[in-house]
Design a protein with these regions (language model features):
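Catalytic alpha-helical scaffold of carbohydrate-active enzymes acting on polysaccharides/glycoconjugates
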Residues: 1-160, 165-231, 249-271, 278-321
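Positively charged, amphipathic and often flexible ligand-engagement surfaces
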Residues: 234-236
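Extended hydrophobic-aromatic, low-complexity segments
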Residues: 240-241
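Helix-loop elements that line ligand-binding/catalytic pockets
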Residues: 244-245
């Protein structure tokens, strides 16, 4: 039987993933708390042998604004809605990690890179949105080239990519492969995402699925698409939501049942979240993650489940042919 695999990935973006919809003052506590939680997560991963992919926005590789600007593409994303572009923020946010810790994160990049089993991946250079009107595949390619260039000049070879908000269309997968990526994380492949297009209902069903098995078990066999491995996200680890706090036990039970199903059937289960998701109520979230990864230890012992980061999983799959 195939070996079962647990993949963990994190969308490492600081405030760049929120700047188009939030004021920093509204979310700063979460971002700064997420920064403080990263060493705790790395220690948790070390204790349980968890190999994870940290998909970082390219801006985080820069030590300061001057260094970052040298990598700005000549062709920037042409979104119809200009607030979507992070480039508009420069000049008003501070120039380095000391003055703008919600926007710069080079010290965290170095911390992650030094930890065993942790892979640095890409969350695009500018937190690029592939489904927004006005942008083009050529602009997307320019963004990816910038992301790989700033990382390569600092000794990092990025081969795994997670697209912001999981926005991917078929014409973008060959662009990712041509840019040098071998793995990406697509959005959950279930009936909610495929058939429900009315956004209020979609949000309700996605929230309910956190606690109840509306969409099945989430395990799968990864596929190669145009030379790039699609490592679909199985489950986002959702942060504590106070109005439904009494259902937290169901949330953890749901994740563990999905992990068990994957372990028993030789499938891949891909768990993901953002560091800022655990930036408030951090100790509660760390206790929950400890419970999840202690359960992984049991599945490893009983069923031989493995922990691989996205790059490791993709290499294994591509080498098998």
């Amino acid at each position: 039987m195939r070996e079962s695999t647990l993949i963990v990935s994190l969308d490492f973006e600081l405030f760049w993933g929120m700047q188009d919809g939030w004021e920093l003052s509204e979310y700063e506590e979460n971002i700064l708390g997420g920064r403080a939680a990263i060493p705790k997560m790395l220690e948790l991963f070390r204790r349980h042998g968890i190999h994870a992919t940290w998909a970082a926005v390219g801006y985080l590789f820069g030590r300061n604004e001057g260094e970052l600007r040298r990598y700005f593409p000549t062709e920037l994303p042409g979104y119809d809605d200009p607030k979507l572009s992070g480039y508009r923020c420069f000049g008003s946010i501070g120039t380095d990690e000391g003055s703008a810790p919600c926007y710069y994160g080079r010290s965290l990049i170095d911390l992650i890179a030094a930890a065993e089993g942790q892979e640095l991946g890409s969350h695009t250079f500018s937190h690029y949105y592939c489904r927004e009107p006005g942008q083009t595949t050529a602009q997307f390619r320019a963004d990816l080239d910038a992301a790989r260039a700033i990382a390569a000049d600092q000794g990092f070879d990025l081969t795994s990519i997670i697209l912001p908000r999981n926005q991917c269309e078929p014409e973008y997968t060959p662009v990712m492969r041509e840019a040098g990526f071998t793995a990406y994380r697509d959005e959950e492949n279930d009936w909610i995402h495929e058939k429900i297009h009315f956004k209020p209902l979609l949000r309700i069903l996605r929230l309910a699925d956190v606690y109840l098995p509306l969409t099945g078990q989430g395990g799968y066999i990864p596929k190669v698409e145009n030379g790039i491995v699609n490592l679909v996200g199985s489950r986002m680890y959702k942060p504590f939501f106070k109005p439904l706090g009494f259902l937290e036990g169901l949330k953890l039970r749901r994740i563990k049942k999905q992990m068990l199903h994957a372990a028993k059937n030789g499938l891949t289960f891909h768990l993901w979240w953002h560091p800022h998701n655990v930036g408030v109520r951090t100790e509660l979230h760390m206790q929950q993650l400890e419970e999840i990864f202690s359960y992984y230890d049991e599945l490893k012992e009983k069923y031989g489940m493995r922990s691989l980061n996205m790059g490791e999983a993709a290499r294994e799959i591509l080498n098998r042919g």
